[in-house]
Curated annotation (Swiss-Prot):
Organism for this UniProt entry: Synechococcus sp. (strain CC9605)
GO CC terms of this entry: ribonucleoprotein complex; ribosome
Organism taxonomic ancestry: Bacteria, Bacillati, Cyanobacteriota, Cyanophyceae, Synechococcales
Quaternary structure and partners: Part of the 30S ribosomal subunit. Contacts proteins S5 and S12.
SUPFAM superfamilies named in the record: Ribosomal protein S8
Protein name listed in UniProt: Small ribosomal subunit protein uS8
GO molecular function, one term: rRNA binding
Gene that specifies this protein: rpsH
Keywords (A to Z) from UniProt: Ribonucleoprotein, Ribosomal protein, RNA-binding, rRNA-binding
HAMAP family given in the database record: Ribosomal_uS8_B (MF_01302_B)
Amino acid sequence: MANHDPISDMLTRIRNASEKRHETTKIPASRMTRSIAKVLQQEGFISEISEQGEGIRTELVLALKYSGKHRLPTIRSMQRVSKPGLRIYKNTRGLPKVLGGLGVAIISTSKGVMSDRDARREGVGGEVLCYVY
């Protein structure tokens, strides 16, 4: 079965795994999913990224983070913003602040995929891929 939106698929797999309190989740590897996973790791939403398999069957294995003795997921919500049917672009001044700065917007810029904070620091805008908080 062909996957027409790998970013939405990635977000859904992470969301489902964290709701079920799984330690890890597997997602098909691509340059975009690797970049998004690195941003999630830098922002503290996932603890570890590893690769499994080879060639076209390579998968990313993401170790999810939980907090407290009740193991509450670090990721409360993930929302896809720019979709294949409706792309959303913002300039530097128009970059959103998620939950007043508590969450992260992941932006695809000309300098690579980065968080909204990094994009503001670099002075670049781009496509708003998703919100994570």
